[in-house]
């Protein structure tokens, strides 16, 4: 609502000798019913209100409000038996020095994205800060004997270099926050993202990851930088997916 175009043009049409007409996606005759339904499946929450309903709404409150502990989680005994063989495995990392470091063990079979395990080290709570070498040791132990791709926040240059020396295949994450949140929200809303109940920190963050209301009042859109470490790691993975996964 605080976007300059809305403030200057939408709310003051007479000032510019302009006419404001509100259109929804259903008013676009060039879009087929199939295309409209695809977009309606793609967007959730505030993004649905904006891109489908055409509303100027603020991003506020819980970001992943569409997350359901009933529909977006699974118990360990519900894990598909052939998951490891029928899925591509990736470890997504949000690296911190004073902030927590999180690893997410992700299995993707092309239809469902399963976050099966998580690693957490909070140097403040543990009163002990780990080195890049120690984190690399932990990641290799977390990975186990079967190697896989590791996606890491690009700002963690020294950690990426340490993993490279260990022979780990590292991909620098796409750290686009707004687009990553939009994509992640869509996959959560369509129940494509499934989280094992043992990943308690990631599940907790689904309810505590919130928009920054003060930034919204300035016309900016960004999340509060706290309780976001597992959510960031998940976003890094989602940003690595091809566009067709969001259709």
Where are the model-predicted features located?
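Conserved beta-strand scaffold positions in the cores of enzyme catalytic domains, especially
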Residues: 18-22, 90, 170
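Mg2+-dependent endonuclease catalytic cores in nucleic-acid-processing enzymes, primarily RNase H-like
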Residues: 104, 110-225, 242-245
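Stable alpha-helical structural segments in soluble proteins, enriched in small hydrophobic residues
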Residues: 229-240
């Amino acid at each position: 609502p605080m976007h300059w175009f809305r403030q200057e043009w939408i709310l003051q049409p007479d000032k510019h000798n302009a006419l404001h007409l509100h259109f929804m996606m259903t008013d676009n005759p060039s879009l087929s019913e199939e295309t409209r339904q695809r977009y309606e499946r793609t967007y959730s929450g505030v993004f649905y209100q904006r891109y489908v309903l055409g509303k100027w709404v603020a991003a506020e409150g819980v970001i992943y409000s569409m997350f359901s502990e009933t529909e977006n989680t699974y118990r360990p005994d519900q894990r598909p038996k052939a998951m490891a063989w029928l899925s591509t495995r990736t470890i997504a990392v949000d690296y911190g020095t004073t902030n927590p470091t999180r690893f997410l063990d992700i299995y993707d079979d092309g239809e469902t994205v399963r976050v099966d395990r998580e690693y957490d080290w909070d140097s403040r709570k543990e009163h002990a800060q780990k080195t890049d070498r120690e984190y690399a040791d932990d990641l290799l132990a977390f990975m186990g004997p079967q190697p896989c791709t590791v996606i890491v926040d690009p700002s963690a240059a020294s950690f990426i270099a340490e993993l490279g020396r260990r022979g780990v295949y590292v991909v620098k994450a796409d750290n686009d926050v707004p687009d990553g949140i939009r994509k992640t929200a869509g996959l959560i809303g369509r129940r494509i993202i499934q989280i094992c109940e043992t990943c308690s920190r990631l599940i907790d963050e689904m309810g505590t990851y919130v928009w920054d209301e003060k930034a919204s009042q300035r016309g900016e859109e960004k999340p509060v930088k706290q309780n976001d470490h597992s959510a960031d790691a998940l976003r890094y993975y989602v940003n690595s997916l091809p566009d067709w996964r969001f259709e």
